Amino acid sequence: MIKSELVQKIAEANPHLYQRDVENIVNAILDQIVDALAQGDRVELRGFGAFSVKQREARTGRNPRTGKQVDVSSKVVPYFKTGKEMRERLNGAA
């Protein structure tokens, strides 16, 4: 499912909302999550999961095309850990 499909499903489930309003809300939520992560904060949505960032250390990698070793610098990467309720629903317990 892509973002536009998510917006459409939410709009269909809530006929009192305009699709463009739903799109604005979804975009605002995602922007706030990204902004919080950019500041190094953790974003927890109880039952759904938690977004955080982790520091990936610098390492020596390999170019798969040439086989040549390359230095890969350290970077911050997003991380998502699923919540208990989501895991239970996905595994049919709920």
Curated annotation (Swiss-Prot):
Entry's Gene Ontology molecular function annotations: DNA binding; structural constituent of chromatin
Identify the SUPFAM superfamilies for this entry: IHF-like DNA-binding proteins
Q: One GO BP annotation here?
A: regulation of DNA-templated transcription
The superkingdom listed in its UniProt entry is: Bacteria
Q: Which residues form the signal peptide?
A: none
What Gene Ontology cellular-component terms does the record carry? chromosome; cytosol
Query: What are the alphabetically sorted keywords of the record?
Result: DNA recombination, DNA-binding, Transcription, Transcription regulation, Translation regulation
Q: Which Pfam families match?
A: Bac_DNA_binding
Q: Tell me, how does this one assemble?
A: Heterodimer of an alpha and a beta chain.
Relate the protein's function as given in its record. Answer: This protein is one of the two subunits of integration host factor, a specific DNA-binding protein that functions in genetic recombination as well as in transcriptional and translational control.
Q: Record's HAMAP family?
A: IHF_beta (MF_00381)
Family assignment from sequence similarity: Belongs to the bacterial histone-like protein family.
UniProt-recorded name of the protein? Integration host factor subunit beta
Species whose genome carries this gene: Azorhizobium caulinodans (strain ATCC 43989 / DSM 5975 / JCM 20966 / LMG 6465 / NBRC 14845 / NCIMB 13405 / ORS 571)
Gene symbol of the encoding locus: ihfB
